Amino acid sequence: MNLPITHNAAASRFETIVDGHLCVADYQLDDGVMTMTHTLVPPALEGRGIAAALVAAALAHARASGLRVRPACNYAARSMQRHRETLDLLVA
């Protein structure tokens, strides 16, 4: 899905607006580790690949920034398992 996703560093999240609804992937950054804490997509928008796009944007940012990732969010953890090319980002 091709969405305009914004990195809102001040709010520690990646976000997009779809059909007037804010969708987010929240994270916490500490000592070079991006802990992905939560994804939120309203139920009416589920199944459209929005959460996947948000997580992909967060992981791309982590890679480009030299960050490691801790997927505390179940969705982010499952996404990383499905996209094994991202597993090298995991915190040891």
Language-model features: locations:
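N-terminal first-folded block
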Residues: 1-39
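Intrinsically disordered, low-complexity sequence elements enriched in Ser/Thr/Gly/Pro
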Residues: 11, 46, 66-68
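Residue-level recognition of the GNAT/N-acetyltransferase active site
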Residues: 42
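Conserved acetyl-CoA pyrophosphate-binding loop and the N-cap/start of the following alpha-helix
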Residues: 45, 49-54
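C-terminal structural segments of small proteins and small subunits
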Residues: 57-92
